[in-house]
Amino acid sequence: MPNSIERALEGIVVCDFSWVGAGPIATSVLAQCGADVIKIESVKRPDTLRRGEPFKDGIGTGLDRSGYFAARNANKRDIALDMSHPRAREVAVRLIEKSDIVINNFRVGQMEKWKLGWEDVQKINPRAIYVTMSMQGIDGPHSRYMGYGVNLNALCGLTARAGFPGQAPFGTGTNYTDHVMVPTHTLFGIMAALLEREATGRGQTVSLSQLESAICMTPSAPMAFAANGEALGPQGYGDPEAAPHGVYTTLGYRKWIAIAVFDDAQWATLRRVMGNPPWAEDERFATIEMRRRHAAELDERIEGWTATQYGDWLMEALLKAGVAAGEVRDAREAIEDEHLRRRGFWAYLDHPEVGVTLYNRAPIVFSRTPVEMKSAAPSIGQHTREVLGGMLGYSHGEIEDLAAQQVLV
């Protein structure tokens, strides 16, 4: 790693075979921290998110109008490489020789088919850190099974907890595992491996099981079963340690507020904000244990009050008093949030096809090294000639020969 750097990962090169959600989110963070992330795709097998809604102006023709893809692939360079072509491997090998990190989230065995598994990469570049983010890890009886976020939500136990008591689980509405835990754990692994390489000069495998990462989202469920044999089911908005704890109606069109009270001092504060109504003196609500026991009755009382208040005023009043509260917001309100704007969370980048587009940066801020959104998501092959002719040392004639043989598509 260089001694004098503008951004934290300046000089780090990433050979990025990842696609869809978890992998591209992780490599996007690396790119925003300064790494040169080179995404490998082919028009024959593009990242499937290129066809994922929402599309700019609702027009989904082509492969460059997906906001979903754009959000996960800003700051990257992209080369077109048909890995099914016999000559594609030689290009990939040259890139791996220059790379610090080689990452994929394919099903186990795919990289080996291209002779680019860990054993191969280790011979090509002993300093390379080889990152694999398969569904259930690289070994074990289920290692070769495929899956997506919705399957992980189910397998890890998250779906079983989503919903309300007495009803069938109804899912989470989004693939939390793809968006949060899997890329986060992957990034921890990458940074630890980079640090260890500083001492040894050698790369290693960072093998992540997306299922195991996802299980870390619901630690209370396996612990409850291990402790007392209880299989936890849907719990709605409730929390075993808090009351009130839920989402309540407020004044206005489709408005709600989330309120959480974890101890008796917070309850006393909430009572003051409510104006100390007589019902709050009920002995059923005197302690946190009693409030949990009578949560349904308490929620009904709380909502009777919140329904007479405007959510924005109520959130500010509760937060200033010391009660955790959050107004339920939609995407427009999040984009217009003054706090997020001042922190520079949102960035606008100009894309050659869809024009100026909104992106969110990685949710970290360093005191010295910037985390930046510099370039919009790339088109397939946008940087092929730039990377091959510059970084990889191919001559103009060699690039033309590869193009003529349909390797660079």
Curated annotation (Swiss-Prot):
EC numbers on record: 2.8.3.15
Keyword check for Transferase: yes
Source organism superkingdom: Bacteria
Entry keyword Secreted: no
Keywords: Aromatic hydrocarbons catabolism, Transferase
Pfam family, one: CoA_transf_3
Pathway(s) of this molecule: Xenobiotic degradation; toluene degradation
Signal peptide residue numbers: none
GO function terms (MF aspect): succinyl-CoA:(R)-benzylsuccinate CoA-transferase activity
UniProt enzyme class: transferase
Gene3D superfamilies, alphabetized: Crotonobetainyl-coa:carnitine coa-transferase, domain 1, formyl-coa transferase, domain 3
Protein name as it appears in the record: Succinyl-CoA:(R)-benzylsuccinate CoA-transferase subunit BbsF
